[in-house]
Structure formats: structure tokens, C-alpha cells
Amino acid sequence: MRLRVVAVGRPRLAYARLGVEEYARRMRRYAPLDLVFVRKGEELLPKAEGHRKVVLDERGRLLTTEELYRRLLAWEGERVAFLVGGAEGHPEAVREEADLLLSLSPLTLQHELALLVLMEQLYRVLTLRAGHPYHRP
């Protein structure tokens, strides 16, 4: 599985930037990862061309870690892009192209925090896939 995370704007908050960098470093031990930052939401889709598209959206489906793991296993061998919008959310065109609209929480999350939570969950899923004991249900 090849993962790409495309986010609007680089994290400016120190905790988010450091956390995203740390989880990206950890994830690359388990799967190829591209971490791409764009300036505007309209730039997300071109960066996800040829990938399954998982769009983070507060109106999306809430999945457990295990459900996300199973979904990604079903896409094994494919390229999967996770699209994280900026403060304004996603343009409608991005939501319409989604293979999966995913909500990380019923709460509204600041976009840098949402990116960090996504990175931790992707790391968790990759360790599950590898049989690593990081995830303890």
C-alpha cells in the first residue's frame, strides 16, 4: 500500500508540526508515504490523481481504527490519498470525488490537529497490518 497525505497548508503550530513529522518518520518504516502540502483546497485533487481518495470531512463516516484498517486492507496494492482541507474545509468538488468521506470525530477539529490525528491513526493502522503491538484494542 502506498499512502499519500495531501494537506492544505503546512502545520504552523509547533506541536502539530513536530507530531506530523514524527508520525511520518515512523510510518515510512511500514509503507511508502508521500506527505504533500498545498496552498489551496483546489490543489488537492490534482495531487491525488490516480489514487483512491479519502477526504476528511466532519460530515463523513465515523470509523473505528479496526474499520479503517479493514478498509485500507481492501485497497491493498492501490495508492491511497488522504485529503485534509484547510480552515475553510473542502471545496464541494473535492467531496464529490471522494471514495470515502471520513470523519475523525463528531467534534469539529482545527485542521492542523485533524492532520496530526490522521497521521497517528495511519501509523496505528500500519502497525496493525505489520502485527506490531502498538495498537491494543
Curated annotation (Swiss-Prot):
Family membership noted in the UniProt record: Belongs to the RNA methyltransferase RlmH family.
Subunit-level organization: Homodimer.
Gene: rlmH
Residues where S-adenosyl-L-methionine binds: L56, G85, L104, S105, P106, L107, T108, L109
Physiological role: Specifically methylates the pseudouridine at position 1915 (m3Psi1915) in 23S rRNA.
Main location, first listed in the record: cytoplasm
Localization annotation: Cytoplasm
GO CC terms of this entry: cytoplasm
Keyword S-adenosyl-L-methionine among UniProt keywords: yes
The protein's name in its UniProt record: Ribosomal RNA large subunit methyltransferase H
Enzyme Commission number(s) of this protein: 2.1.1.177
A single GO molecular function term of this UniProt record: rRNA (pseudouridine-N3-)-methyltransferase activity
Substrates-to-products reaction catalysed: pseudouridine(1915) in 23S rRNA + S-adenosyl-L-methionine = N(3)-methylpseudouridine(1915) in 23S rRNA + S-adenosyl-L-homocysteine + H(+)
Organism ancestry: Bacteria, Thermotogati, Deinococcota, Deinococci, Thermales
